[in-house]
Structure formats: C-alpha cells, structure tokens
Swiss-Prot record:
The protein's name in its UniProt record: Uncharacterized endoplasmic reticulum membrane protein YJR015W
Skewed-composition ranges (Basic and acidic residues): 53-66
GO CC field: cytoplasm; endoplasmic reticulum; endoplasmic reticulum membrane; membrane
Family of the protein in this entry: To yeast SNG1.
Transmembrane segments annotated in the record for this chain: 90-110, 124-144, 313-333, 350-370, 382-402, 417-437, 475-495
Comment field (misc): Present with 639 molecules/cell in log phase SD medium.
The keyword Endoplasmic reticulum belongs to this UniProt entry's keyword annotation: yes
Region called Disordered, residue ranges: 38-76
Cytoplasmic side: 111-123, 334-349, 403-416, 496-510
Topological region Lumenal: 1-89, 145-312, 371-381, 438-474
Localisation: Endoplasmic reticulum membrane
Superkingdom assignment: Eukaryota
Low complexity bias locations: 67-76
Length: 510
C-alpha cells in the first residue's frame, strides 16, 4: 500500500525537521571556516567560474536568534537591548575621544601656548667691546658716554637668561686678545649652541660717529658696522625668527629710540657749544648719524624651502611608514608563527623588520634626493649615505616601538590602533617641532623620542650646524632599538597569551 505525504504523522515530520537542524548546527563552524578561507579568493562554481560568496549570503539560524526580527523602527520594543547597546557604545566612544582631545591634543597645543613666559630659559649673549666712557679728541678734553653705555639697562628689561660681558671680562674668560678674536669667538659660541643669539657691540663706534659729524672727509657713520646680531636659522628654521630673534629686534627698536631722542641731541650740543667744534655742512653726514640699526648675521641660514619636507613634516610620514609595514606583514607573521619554533620566529620577525626598514629608508631618502637637495654641506659627498643610515636607525627605533605597541593594543581590540598611532605621532612632534627652551619642563621627555633626535641629525646634514649633539642623538636611537628588540619576545608572548584567552572565552560562549 502506497503511503502519501498526508499519511505521515505530524510528530514524525517534526522529528525529521529537528534532526536536519541538529546536523546543520553541528557542521556550522566547520562550514564557516571553509567559507571564511574562500571569501577573499572567491568560490568556484560548477562551471569553474569564480564567484563571490558575499554577494548573496544565506542567513543562518544563529543570526536569526542573535537579532530580533526587523520592526522598521529604532524605538520598537523588540530593539530595547540594541538601544541600550548603542547608547553604551555612544557614551564610551565619546569619552574615549574626549580623553584623546584633553591629553594628546592638549600636549600639542601646550607646546605653542604663551611661550613668552618661558623667555627666562633662553640663553643669550651680549658683548660690549666699547668702554662706557670715551675720549673723543687727542687732548683728552672731550669725554662723553659711549653710544652703547645704556644698553645693559634695556637688556635687563627683557626677562631672558642674559650673559653680559665687557671686553676685558670676555677676553679673560675665553682666552682671546684682539677685537677680531672676540668677534670670532662670539660666532663660535652661537655655532656651538651655547646661546640662541649674540649681540656683539664692536669698538670705536663713538669715535667714528664723532669724526663723521666734524669732518667732511670722514666716511658716513654706519651703525651696522659696529652692532651685530649673530644667530643661526638652521638651528630651528621654523621657530627662531618668529619666537626668539624678535627679542633682538625689540632691543634694537628700543635703543634706536633712545639714541635718536636721548643720546644724539646732547652729543651735538656738546660738540658745538661746549667743545666749540663746527659740525659738517654736509647734510648727508647728519642724516646718516641719525640712524642706529643692527646688522643681522645668519651664520647658518635656511634658504631652501624644500628642506622643510625632510627636516619636519616628512619625518612624520617616515614614522607612519614604520606603522604600515607592520600591518602589511601581520597576516604573514601569524602564518609563520605556526610553522617556526619560537627562537626562529623571533629571528624571522627581527630580520623582516630590519631589512624592510633598510629599503624603506632608502626609498624615503631617494625622494628627498629627487628634488635636488644638497647633501654635501656638512659631510661632503658622503652626505647622502649619512642621511640614509640615520633614517634607517630612526625607522628601526620608531618601528620597534610601533611593533610592540601594536601587539599590545590588539589584545584590547584592533579598533584602538588609530588612537595609538595618533598618540605616538603627537608625543614625538610636540617636543620636536618647537624649541624646548620655550616650553614647560614636562616637554623635556622629548630628548628620548626618536623624532627629536633624528631632526637634530638632519639639521646637521642639511644646515651644517654643530655636530656636538650627534653622539647623544645616535646613542639614544641605538638604545631605543636595543630596548624594543629586547622587549619584543616578552610582548609577543604576553599578546599571544591574551589572544588565546579571548579565543577560549569566545569558543565557550558560542
């Protein structure tokens, strides 16, 4: 007797459906792993064509239970749990963004805020080679104050860290004798970065002014021959002229006003009425005597704008390259960790990073060379090699820190990687792009940051500033490389253990 579908009892039919569902659930994880491996490459269909399994995904029973049926409204009673989840995530995300703004951004903004109150930390030099009182005629009958006698009064009104010398004290301290040796030593002190700038008042300014006023054959008085400000833009191309050099310009402005209103008129009166000298009839001489300006001598000038790329913002891009290389190698590192012993895996990781940075640093430096930057100012024809090797050390130091930090951040969640890289960039550039002398002492942590040290090295290469800090700069970079390399196996073990624990918890909950 033939049975139809209607003859089957409902209970038996329900049991068949339950068995089918049970089997499908047991195979769901194995199936998902297979599909997961195939998604990136596509799944071949029966005709041998590659299809994308993500185009028409089949909803499984787990998805159906995890999410309630769509009600069409965010405020549906069925979505009460989801609304709570969204609210908590919203609050957490905004709190995290607030923390970043009120820590990292505050750190960067603070490096630029109210820098004038830190002028007392800026070391400046003043050398006055002319005595405060000058004898103007051969008979020693005309004694007048020198042009620069009041300069210390104006200098002390500006709260910088001043070192003021007259000619005898400067010669004794620095073992120099002649005025030319004094001038050369002033330049050397600025070059060695003992001072941010120096005001050098040279001798015989008052006598030259007097001769120009009474003698038609004397040269015109030119104050810039006797007043010189020595500085180096190459020491800080973006900040020195805007934040520190204005101090010298302010002193020049103050003293010019004092000279034209308070010094020159009484001097002219003394010359004509007290000492009975006749002033020159040449108006050009009188007009020239009314000007009192400084000569600004930039010992290491910044003349090529393209150098801002490798010595400032380009360093940030180089830092980001060290972050990207780790992300690109991430899947390969996971695969190799499964087939290599721990010791061999560690050697593999270090070798991959070091060789990658070796070539990446070459590519970065070649980009600078493409724009015809002069590498010969400090190290001659070997300048490019010095630049390349310095960049390699920088990438090793920064890349090692990134690699260790990224592994730790991933244990919290890969969604936080952006916060790390943003924080790492700001921690590096805040004490590196702006002079530490004009910042709070908290920014002195920058001395141990890779960006700060490599920028110092780059300024030697491109501007030929002093090399006296290069030993410290290279030493810190090498120390950072050694530290990050030593921490790598411990950080790797910790991150691996945490990820395994997360995987076990997830497996138990599934």
């Amino acid at each position: 007797m033939t049975s139809s579908l209607d003859d089957i009892e409902p209970t038996a039919y329900n049991n068949m459906e339950a068995d089918e569902e049970y089997c499908r659930r047991n195979d769901i994880h194995d199936l998902s792993s297979v599909v997961g491996d195939a998604v990136s490459q596509g799944v071949p269909d029966m005709d041998g064509q590659t299809t994308d399994s993500s185009k028409d995904p089949e909803p499984n029973s787990e998805d159906k239970k995890a999410f309630p049926p769509s009600s069409g409204s965010f405020f549906s009673p069925n979505l009460q749990g989801q609304r709570k989840k969204v609210l908590l995530k919203f609050v957490f995300t905004n709190c995290l963004l607030a923390i970043i703004c009120f820590t990292m951004f505050v750190l960067f903004w603070g490096a630029l805020y109210d820098t004038s109150k830190y002028l007392h930390k800026v070391k400046l030099l003043v050398v006055i080679q002319e005595p405060p009182v000058v004898i103007l005629d051969n008979n020693s009958s005309m004694v007048v104050p020198s042009i620069s006698y009041a300069l210390p009064t104006f200098i002390n009104k500006i709260p910088c860290d001043w070192d003021i010398y007259n000619s005898p004290t400067f010669q004794a301290k620095f073992d120099v004798n002649t005025p030319q040796q004094v001038n050369d030593k002033v330049v050397d002190l600025v070059y060695d970065e003992k001072y941010w700038f120096a005001i050098n008042i040279k001798p015989n300014a008052t006598e030259t002014l007097f001769e120009s006023l009474i003698n038609d054959t004397a040269p015109l008085f030119n104050s810039t021959l006797f007043n010189q400000v020595v500085y180096e833009t190459g020491r800080d191309p973006t900040n020195l002229k805007s934040t520190i050099l204005p101090v010298a310009q302010t002193i020049e402005e103050y003293y010019h006003t004092f000279y034209t209103l308070n010094y020159l008129p009484p001097l002219l009166t003394n010359i004509t009425q007290v000492y009975r000298y006749a002033l020159t009839n040449n108006a050009r001489y009188i007009a020239a005597a009314g000007k009192y300006n400084y000569e600004y001598y930039d010992h290491r000038p910044f003349t090529d704008r393209i150098l801002l790329a490798p010595t400032q913002i380009g360093v940030v891009y180089c830092l980001l390259l060290t972050f990207f290389q780790f992300l690109l190698y991430g899947p390969l590192h996971v695969e190799m960790a499964k087939v290599l012993r721990p010791a061999n895996g560690l050697i593999y990781r270090i070798a991959m990073s070091w060789f990658t940075f070796f070539f990446a640093s070459l590519f970065f430096c070649t980009t600078t060379a493409i724009f015809q930057v002069d590498f010969t100012k400090s190290f001659g024809r070997g300048g490019f090699v010095v630049y390349w090797m310095s960049t390699w050390l920088f990438m090793l130091a920064a890349g090692g820190a990134n690699e260790n930090a990224v592994m730790l951040v991933i244990t919290l969640g890969p969604q936080y990687l952006g916060f790390w890289i943003l924080s790492f960039v700001i921690l590096n550039i805040a004490p590196s792009f702006f002079p530490l002398a004009l910042n709070n002492n908290v920014y002195r942590y920058g001395y141990m940051m890779p960006v700060h040290n490599v920028i110092d090295i780059y300024r030697v290469i491109f501007f030929d500033v002093t090399r006296r800090k290069m030993g410290r700069n290279y030493g810190i970079l090498v120390a950072l490389i050694a530290l990050n390399t030593a921490l790598l196996p411990f950080v790797g073990k910790y991150a691996s253990r945490k990820l395994k624990q997360k995987a076990l918890v997830a497996a138990k909950q599934s």
